Amino acid sequence: KAFAMRADYVNANPNATRALLKAVMEAQMYCEEPANREEVARICAKRRWINAPFEDIVDRMRGDFDYGTGRVVQNSPHQMRYWKDFASYPFQSHDLWFLTENIRWGYLPRDFDGKAWIAKVNREDLWRAAAAELGVPAAQIPKSTSRGVEKFFDGKVFDPANPKAYLDSLTIKHLRGQGAA
């Protein structure tokens, strides 16, 4: 999930920017509420959005999964998140991981300075201001710009303090100028 706006728009329209952010945040909070999941799934199932069977969408929103192997999980903690667990917060560590993945696949050069780019474009200050205007409790606002070290399902670890170590640990990648690895 990402929400991006051009810097020239943000600078020229600060009130509209905050209004847009607050509207998105309120929608995320609404979607997060279990009582609203069925309604949200019905909306998303429509042709103009996901165009998928309602049952397929609502089960995932509730955290009900049928893995097709006889393994069925209900009310999984791994259900779709919209607001809880800082799902909408623009963590700089997430930005760095996405940029690192773009380096991994050769879309950005290996020497790309992701941290400098993030410092220019990540506007978590706007998110925090919108959250404050909405009266979001402090417990729902991250204390850090980083989620810290992330461990993925395959056991790989991404430490935002050392993205090169993550890249070096990957066996499947294409790094520009180095051919397929």
Regions found by a protein language model. Name each.
Residues 96-181:
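Conserved C-terminal helix/tail region of periplasmic/extracytoplasmic solute-binding proteins
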Residues 13-121:
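Secondary-structure end/capping motifs
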Residues 1-13, 21:
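Periplasmic-binding protein-like
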